[in-house]
């Protein structure tokens, strides 16, 4: 790791606030991927996630003094701003897509990977399972979805999630428990739903 990479966020932010493009680039590369993944997992919309993250960084650069190092890390501050933007987006646009293989410029995607399969049929089945999982996650109310995304998909501790959201640890535990229950119920419904069978072209009915 270079000396520049080891510089503290608050030092880089002060430099970026004075017009140092290299410092801004370092900050962007350090935090962009994690913020994008969170925005994508919450919104289910790659375009919206990218727009939200870009807006978060532009807001920071317009007024760097909004971040107070005494109140926490820059990463936590950026997450909080991103979270607020995502929640506002969800209020305006409740409809969501299922993000399967969306990637950002650093190759960071939704976090659910479609593994290579030996046959097209297996690939299709695995894709369907991933679609079901994402549909179930995105169907959760925002507060429960956020707990599932942070603690399950991003594997953050209860303490980290509580600090990021700004609520007691007990609230995180309760939301995660409820979110898991709703998620499992939704997946059960999807699993038990009648499945459409598509026959290959050569499997036509004999005349």
Cite the ranges covered by each PLM segment.
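Residues within the DNA-recognition helix of helix-turn-helix
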Residues: 31, 175-178, 182
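Structural recognition of an alpha-helix C-terminal capping motif at a helix-to-coil junction
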Residues: 37, 51-58, 72-84
């Amino acid at each position: 790791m270079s000396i520049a990479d080891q510089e503290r966020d608050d030092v880089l932010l002060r430099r970026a606030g004075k017009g140092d493009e290299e410092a801004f680039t370092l900050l962007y590369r350090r935090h962009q991927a994690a913020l994008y993944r969170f925005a994508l997992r919450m919104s289910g919309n790659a375009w919206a996630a990218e727009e939200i993250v870009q807006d978060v960084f532009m807001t920071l650069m317009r007024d760097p003094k909004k971040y107070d190092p005494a109140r926490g890390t820059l990463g936590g501050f950026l997450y909080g701003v991103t979270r607020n933007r995502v929640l506002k987006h969800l209020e305006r646009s409740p409809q969501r897509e299922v993000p399967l293989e969306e990637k950002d410029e650093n190759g960071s995607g939704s976090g659910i990977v479609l593994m290579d399969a030996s046959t097209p049929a297996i690939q299709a089945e695995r894709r369907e399972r991933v679609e079901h999982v994402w549909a179930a996650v995105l169907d959760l109310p925002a507060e429960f979805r956020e707990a599932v995304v942070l603690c399950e998909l991003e594997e953050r501790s209860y303490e980290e999630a509580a600090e990021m959201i700004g609520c007691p640890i007990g609230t995180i535990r309760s939301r995660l428990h409820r979110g898991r229950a709703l998620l499992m119920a939704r997946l059960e419904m999807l699993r038990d739903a009648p499945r459409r069978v598509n026959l290959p072209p050569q499997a036509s009915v004999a005349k």
